């Protein structure tokens, strides 16, 4: 009789409850190249040994339940169970441990981030034996990542489509995010694109409200794009947010965007859901649309240090589900992001092969094989004085997005865009000439401002603006 069909009739079924660690804590297990590996930060309840807590996580996120069941004998648990194969204390934290769990690949549906998360984090986070639980990292084996399409196009294809090389891309979120009419919204888009930006953007909560229905916004933004392209000779885009209450409505909006001939659409992937996002990503590849991803709601999931899911996991999931851009923090602006940790998941978004590096929060070596990369988007409370630091931190393969830092310019939207474009070009030129952006950044901006009155005005407005709060996301 095969292992999968062998029963326990010969030994008799013994009902009852036994410790998880007897079955799911396997410190001698050697991980396989095809296993999905997870690193959980576990905070057990008082009196619960870390081995039992780690084993409980492995059990409840794979084949286990609270009691022995008769149907265990109808399959091979050794083949399908998750295994807690290593536990280590968290330095500097009391009663916190990193539990490493290996999952056999057969537990997961191919090409489904939804199923992967339903298994690994779907139920275990409410387990009473744990005070708190955080998924810090996942190792996605090539055998699984190859079942995903991934980003619709990727970094190089996007550059080729836009004919823009050798520098970060520049964007702007239109403000106020809610309340503008479609025509005034389109006017703001045109002014920003005419001034030198590559992209403008719908804010995450701009969908189809009474003051501005989606079809009207799409039409006026398309008009703005074509007018700005004709005047500047550059390819322009606006992230048209296709997020909607149903997948059918979302696809209808994406189809209309394609019919208008615009280059890019947008989706809120966490509030919209991974199933909807993957469907949209497939449509975008098939129809030549770039896909910008907003991470609205991420901080509800990832901001607490001891409970939830770290953003590096959500970033990996997005690369699998599909997106050409994703917001990734700024390090220097108003939103969360500690430098080394942020650069860790930026590399996980962009690079093909990323070595394990615990100093940057990377618990596993990740090999994406040929899955296209994702451009990280720096957005939130940034302005021209941040440009040298952003250029140095994020490099060329990034999108730098200035909302208030464009639209808050004292002379208007187009001069605000000019100021940002001049600051960026000055920083890129200085870097290419061998200057140190970290040390000489302010001087570089001041030099450029001498021949750009728009930049000089922006420098004066934002010279005192800083967001100096400690990052919550630390190792």
Curated annotation (Swiss-Prot):
Per its UniProt record, what Pfam families does this chain match? RuBisCO_large (PF00016), RuBisCO_large_N (PF02788)
Q: Return the cofactor note field.
A: Binds 1 Mg(2+) ion per subunit.
The PTM entry states: The disulfide bond which can form in the large chain dimeric partners within the hexadecamer appears to be associated with oxidative stress and protein turnover.
Question: InterPro entries annotated for this entry?
Answer: RuBisCO, RuBisCo_large_chain_AS, RuBisCO_lsu_C, RuBisCO_lsu_C_sf, RuBisCO_lsu_fd_N, RuBisCO_lsu_N_sf, RuBisCO_lsuI
Residues noted as binding Mg(2+) in the record, renumbered to the chain: 201, 203-204
Locate the active site: 175, 294
Propeptide at 1-2
List the keywords (alphabetical).
Answer: Acetylation, Calvin cycle, Carbon dioxide fixation, Chloroplast, Disulfide bond, Lyase, Magnesium, Metal-binding, Methylation, Monooxygenase, Oxidoreductase, Photorespiration, Photosynthesis, Plastid
Q: Name one GO cellular component term.
A: chloroplast
**MF terms per GO, please?**
magnesium ion binding; monooxygenase activity; ribulose-bisphosphate carboxylase activity
Could you name the domain of life of the organism this protein comes from?
Eukaryota
Q: Which residues carry this modification: N-acetylproline?
A: 3
The record, for CDD domains, names:
RuBisCO_large_I
Instruction: Give residue numbers for the modification (N6,N6,N6-trimethyllysine).
Output: 14
Localization per Swiss-Prot or TrEMBL: Plastid, Chloroplast
Record-stated family: Belongs to the RuBisCO large chain family. Type I subfamily.
Q: Which PANTHER family match?
A: RIBULOSE BISPHOSPHATE CARBOXYLASE, RIBULOSE BISPHOSPHATE CARBOXYLASE LARGE CHAIN
What is the stated purpose of this protein?
RuBisCO catalyzes two reactions: the carboxylation of D-ribulose 1,5-bisphosphate, the primary event in carbon dioxide fixation, as well as the oxidative fragmentation of the pentose substrate in the photorespiration process. Both reactions occur simultaneously and in competition at the same active site.
By what name is this protein known? Ribulose bisphosphate carboxylase large chain
Organism field: Betula papyrifera (Paper birch)
- Whichever gene encodes this chain, its name is rbcL
């Amino acid at each position: 009789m095969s292992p999968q069909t062998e029963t326990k009739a010969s030994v008799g079924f013994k009902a009852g409850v036994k410790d998880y660690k007897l079955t799911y804590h396997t410190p001698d297990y050697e991980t396989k190249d095809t296993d999905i590996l997870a690193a959980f930060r576990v905070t057990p309840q008082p009196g619960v040994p870390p081995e039992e807590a780690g084993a409980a996580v492995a059990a409840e996120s794979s084949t286990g339940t609270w009691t022995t069941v008769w149907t265990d004998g109808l399959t091979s648990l050794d083949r399908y169970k998750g295994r807690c194969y290593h536990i280590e204390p968290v330095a500097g934290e009391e009663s916190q441990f990193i539990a490493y769990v290996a999952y056999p690949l057969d537990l997961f549906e191919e090409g489904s981030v939804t199923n992967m998360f339903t298994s690994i984090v779907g139920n275990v986070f409410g387990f009473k034996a744990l005070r708190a639980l955080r998924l810090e990292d996942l190792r996605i084996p090539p055998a699984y990542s190859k079942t995903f399409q991934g980003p619709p196009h990727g970094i190089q294809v996007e550059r080729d489509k836009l004919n823009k090389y050798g520098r970060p891309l520049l964007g702007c979120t239109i403000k106020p995010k809610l309340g503008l009419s479609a025509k005034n919204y389109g006017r703001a888009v045109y002014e920003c694109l005419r001034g030198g930006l590559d992209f403008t953007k719908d804010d995450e909560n701009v969908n189809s409200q009474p003051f501005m229905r989606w079809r009207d916004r799409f039409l006026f933004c398309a008009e703005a794009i074509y007018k700005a392209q004709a005047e500047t000779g550059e390819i322009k885009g606006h992230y048209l947010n296709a997020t909607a209450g149903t997948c059918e409505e979302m696809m209808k909006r994406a189809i209309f965007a394609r019919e208008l001939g615009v280059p890019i659409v947008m989706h809120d992937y966490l509030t919209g859901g991974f199933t909807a996002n993957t469907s949209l990503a497939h449509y975008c590849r098939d129809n030549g649309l770039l896909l910008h991803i907003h991470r609205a709601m991420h901080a509800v999931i990832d901001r607490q240090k001891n409970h939830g899911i770290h953003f590096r996991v959500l970033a990996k999931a997005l690369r699998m589900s599909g997106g050409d851009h994703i917001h990734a923090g700024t390090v220097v602006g108003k939103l969360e992001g500690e430098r080394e940790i942020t650069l860790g998941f930026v590399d996980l978004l962009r690079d093909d092969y990323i070595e394990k590096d615990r100093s940057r929060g990377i618990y596993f070596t990740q090999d994406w094989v040929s899955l296209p990369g994702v451009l990280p988007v720096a957005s939130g409370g940034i302005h021209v004085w941040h440009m040298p630091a952003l250029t140095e931190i994020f490099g060329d393969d990034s999108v730098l997005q200035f909302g208030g830092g464009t639209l808050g310019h004292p002379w208007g939207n187009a001069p605000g865009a000019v100021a940002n474009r001049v600051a960026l070009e000055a920083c890129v030129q200085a870097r290419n000439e061998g200057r140190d952006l970290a040390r000489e950044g302010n001087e570089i901006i001041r030099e450029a401002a001498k021949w750009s009155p728009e930049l000089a005005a922006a420098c004066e407005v934002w010279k005192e603006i800083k967001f100096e709060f400690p990052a919550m996301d630390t190792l």
